[in-house]
Amino acid sequence: MSLIPRPDGVRSFRGYLASAFLLSALPSACLAAAHPSSPTPTSAPTNTTSALVGQRALYDLSLAESGGNTLSATGNMTYVVRDTCSAWSTQQHLDIQSATRNGGAVNMVSDYTTLESKDGRHLVFRTVQKSNDAVLQVVSGEANVDAQGHGVVQYEKPIKKTLKLPDGTLFPMAHTAAILAAAQRGAPNIAPLLFDGTGPDGAQETYITLLGWGPPKDPVTSPALANQPAGRVHVAFFSRTPDSILPDYEIGMRYFANGVSDMLDMDFGDFRMRGTLHSLTLPPRAAHC
């Protein structure tokens, strides 16, 4: 996939958005045909995000490898998570400049906001994606999951419609909490469904591989992470269609116990981008909660 604006450019750009969601929280079983093993199932949470923290993180993005149309790519991503006592408020700004073999210079920008209840049952979302200042797509609406794990999403944009969410679908912060919980108990993999509001097609399949959990082996990039256990995480994203055998995109990262990541490796097929933590601020927990 490529950064050049094309009919599937919105879908391609969704991979960058998913990368950012996994930082905060970064989106059921994966397709059995694609993954013969049986990953640990997950279910809708009651309140699983208590270990996560508010944060303001700035990442530098650079091209790590290219075998396709992308000649160069750089950018930055700002991610802000606020603890509002009963919910998590997130804001993300992503700005990527690239050069392609046949498309010249391209500037891809996204602005994304969510409000996710801490019980994992309600999500309000809005995503605006642009290429060279032209709006590619706006996705907005809200989603709800009941106590039994049955969910529904009501889109306002790009068109008004209602979709059912598969049982067990997790929202972004709950998805991250599930990853961290699995890492801490030593699970080798999990495969929860994710709905993050970055696209108009409902939930995605995710397959998550977890490697090692404990004191970081590599130096940490921020003093705020010095005493946090961490582990390596690899996430593959799949469309929920019968022919989706290969992932749409993949992300590797080092996750800390508080939900912060300081190293990213984003694989989009014909090129890879590396993300490094430039600065991190962890605000104190609200005393009135």
Task: Tell what function each PLM region has.
Residues Q92-V145:
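Hydrophobic/aromatic-rich structural module bridging two neighboring secondary-structure elements via a short loop
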Residues M1-F13:
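N-terminal secretory signal peptides that target proteins for export/translocation
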Residues L61, T90-Q92, L123-T127, D262-M266:
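Short hydrophobic/aromatic-rich beta-strand segments that constitute the beta-sheet cores
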Residues V128-C289:
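Mature, soluble, non-transmembrane domains
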Residues C30-A105:
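N-terminal cleavable signal peptides for secretion/export
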Residues T48-V53, V80-S89, L115-R121, L225-A226, ...:
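A short, structured loop/turn motif at beta-sheet edges
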Residues Y16-A29:
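Bacterial N-terminal signal peptides
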